[in-house]
Each structure stands twice: as C-alpha cells, then as structure tokens.
C-alpha cells in the first residue's frame, strides 16, 4: 500500500463527493452545530438512507467529525470514552413538516478519522464503512472536505490491501467488493443477512467498478495465490472484532437513548427475526440482554 499512487483515486472521489442539503439534513446539521459548536468539522451522511433518500420509518446515519474530543464535549467522561474506544454513538430526533425523523450519529475526531482508515488500523470497523459511498451534510471549510476524501481514499486502499490476499488471482470488481465486504461483516456482531454485501455493491455498481479500476491503476499488488497470512489475520480480526462489538454495545448503553430498543429494531429490520424487549432489558441491559443475544445468535439473527 505504501507504494500506491492514489492521486487518481483522490481526484475521482473528489469529483464524486457531494454535499447533500434538504430540510431534514439541515435540521440535523443545526442540532449538531448547536451541540459541538466550532469543534464540528464535517457531517458525513452514509448508509441505507443515503442510498434510498427515504427518511420515514428509518434511521439516518451520520458521522460528526470534530477537531478533538476535549473541545467537542462539555463532559470529560464522554470525551474520555470517545478517546478510549471510538466512536461514541448518540440518538437524535428532529421534526420536519410535522414528521418526526430519527437518526444516530457517531462522533469521531479528525485525527481518528485519518488514523483508523489507514493501513495502521488493524480492525475493519472504520475502513469498511468509509470505503463505501458517503455524502457530506456539512463541512466547515475545504480542508474538512479534503480530509473526508482522504479518509475514503485511505479506506479503499486499506480494504484492498487487507483482503486481496484472500483471492488466488485478480478478482473482478464485483468479486472483490462482495468478498471484501462480507469479510468485514464477519469481523463484527452484525444483523445483516449474507446477501447484504451483494446488495450494497448492486445499489451503486458504477461507483464500485470505477473505484476498483482506479485502484488497479494505482499500482496495487495482484495476487497469484491465497495468502495464509491474510487468512490467519482475518481469523484474528474476526475474534477481536466480536470483542470490540460487545464493548461498543456496552458503551452505547450510556450514550444512546433507548439503545436496547434500537438494537432490537435493527436486528429485526435486517434479519426478519422478531426481538421481544421488556422493561427488564431496558432497565438492566448488562444483566438481561446476554441470554437474548445468545438466542438471537443461535437463530442466525446476529452473526
């Protein structure tokens, strides 16, 4: 990856990155600006709502990029939590034209954005997400925009370098993206079905094909055999990812209002498995959610 020339990739993603503005996104932008003030550098809009542009009965996904956690938060505890295990995730609702729209936003510093999408980041949590298309709902200046683009360049290069050794020859764009995304999903506790990676690729095939083409022109390694070292790293990454996922879930209980209900909603939405939540789960999630997660894992609702 160090020998890659990613200038063409940067130029391509620069042209592709758009700033999306509508009444709903502007409402969420105002909320985040009010909360984080001058520390807010950009708001990255991503996920299924970006692809569909349908906001009702859905959960919008944002990353709030801040200059540093100490400046962004009034609470030293929240800043410490974000520094120790990024990101902190929060729930927000706005009302637009009489309709309530809900979102979750994750808070990440500029430093972590660039570090955690680089090849130095072992786990795929960040570079798997930022390798996919996103838009900006807000950026403070052109430097903030360029940093978002650089994070995507980093992520694309990193996901390639971390997964290409799983192939015994150069894959097609579809084979690469579907295989790589499936591998990153397996490294977390995810509610997505096994068809999710393929549907994400199909939803924006021209984008993924073009990015893959730019990668090949950047001088990437072309595999001739499956790398046992890469395979082993993904075994370790998957195990470590499950631990990180559990830690992030536990942390989210203190930052995410109605976090247990959101988790149940997301699992049911992606897997079709109904999740029954009662007051005990909400009041004592650390105690009563483990048996529920175990049952969901056995049903295949959580991977």
Give the residues covered by each predicted segment.
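Short glycine-/polar-rich loops that comprise or flank the Walker A/P-loop
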Residues: 58-60
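Catalytic core of pol beta-like nucleotidyltransferases
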Residues: 1-35, 44, 50-56, 68-303
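Short hydrophobic/aromatic beta-strand micro-patches
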Residues: 63-65
């Amino acid at each position: 990856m160090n020998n890659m020339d990613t200038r063409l990739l940067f130029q391509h993603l620069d042209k592709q990155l758009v700033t999306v503005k509508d009444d709903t996104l502007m409402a969420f932008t105002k909320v985040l600006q009010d909360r984080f003030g001058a520390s807010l550098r950009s708001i990255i809009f991503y996920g299924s709502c970006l692809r569909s542009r349908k906001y009702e009965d859905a959960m919008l996904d944002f990353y709030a990029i801040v200059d540093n956690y100490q400046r962004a938060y009034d609470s030293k505890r929240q800043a410490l939590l974000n520094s120790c295990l990024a990101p902190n995730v929060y729930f927000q609702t706005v009302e637009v034209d009489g309709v309530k729209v809900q979102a979750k936003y994750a808070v990440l510093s500029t430093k972590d954005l660039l570090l955690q999408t680089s090849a130095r980041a072992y786990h795929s949590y960040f570079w798997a997400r930022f390798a996919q298309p996103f838009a900006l709902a807000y950026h403070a200046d052109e430097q903030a925009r360029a940093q978002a683009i650089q994070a995507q360049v980093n992520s694309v290069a990193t996901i390639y370098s971390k997964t290409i050794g799983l192939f015994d020859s150069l894959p097609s764009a579809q084979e690469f993206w579907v295989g790589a995304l499936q591998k990153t999903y397996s490294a977390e506790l995810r509610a997505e079905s096994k068809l999710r990676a393929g549907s994400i690729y199909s939803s924006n095939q021209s984008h993924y094909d073009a990015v893959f083409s730019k990668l090949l022109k950047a001088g990437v390694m072309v595999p001739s055999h499956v790398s046992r070292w890469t395979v082993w790293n993904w075994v370790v990454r998957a195990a470590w990812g499950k631990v990180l996922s559990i830690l992030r879930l536990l942390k989210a209980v203190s930052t995410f209002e109605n976090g247990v209900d959101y988790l149940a909603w997301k699992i049911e939405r992606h897997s079709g498995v109904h999740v029954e939540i009662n007051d005990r789960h909400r009041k004592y999630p650390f105690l009563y959610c483990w048996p529920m997660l175990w049952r969901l894992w056995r049903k295949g609702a959580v991977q």
